[in-house]
């Protein structure tokens, strides 16, 4: 009776990659092995050469321990007989595989002839000179002898990083060692002296080192006696010359927060504000008046000083004022004649509401109309600098001795409100 069933160690041996002595052939021939069973002859297969490709050493030892056993079965008991496996070289395995098993075989893996390969262990991987990689080398204690002519590399390993080169100055003719220099000069590979030179030769081209860009530029990109290139200098100057945010921007008046008030700030320096004398402005109205000789019509139009609507409103106001004065004068002619005998300078005018006092010059009959004209002209000059139109005053107007027109108390309170 023949035993057709394959023992479990046969499946493990078939999965191993076996290498021969030549690279062209990868022999996978399996030689028959006799099993001694009482009353039966069973054959099994074993590999002529073994190779390790990615499995752990414990698996190989387990496979060899299984393959080393032969079974003898009798009707009464089963006897285990061991056979020694030997490779083509006939050498035995190290003692690690035979721990705890006195009868386990010993086998040494060899791949041709040659000296043992030196490897570099990085983490869990070991890298060899001919790109042969052995994983889990900690669990495998086999002295591997590898022939570079007989085995082709399976996987390319990472090359060993070379030692860092000592930095030197890249200027031609310098070649100064920068190992003891500053980090800045080591990084950009230039010595401290050549970083300030106006002209150096790098790779056969005349250049200059920019201390802000940290790069070499052509000589045309530098200004004379400047260590930074023209582009960096322009950016630096633009950052330094930023306009003050509290000042005028794009020719528009801005708010002055320094004095906690709204002020019209104009960029032109020729504008000057002066305080006029008290001869041209009423005593109760104080305001800054721009010099007429230094402000053109364009400037007046910009602030709305010569608006046609403003002119029309002022003309209507003055015409109403003249009519009011003349009507009051006509109604009180008799009283003027009586009072003129008592005083040449003071006249009382009767009105339906209440009497008003007029202060005239020495000749009231001849100077009344010119005083009214002067009052209108002075009102023109005073109210012309204010954009909002003042409301019309219906009541009579008091005229002082100095010949300057003045509105009633309502107009003065309005002027104080605008101030």
Swiss-Prot record:
A zinc finger (SBP-type) spans 166-243. Keywords: DNA-binding, Metal-binding, Nucleus, Transcription, Transcription regulation, Zinc, Zinc-finger. Residues 77-96, 230-249 are annotated as: Disordered. The keyword Nucleus applies. Zn(2+) 1 binds at residues 169, 174, 191, 194. The SBP-type zinc finger is required for the binding to DNA. This is Squamosa promoter-binding-like protein 2. It comes from Arabidopsis thaliana. The gene is SPL2.
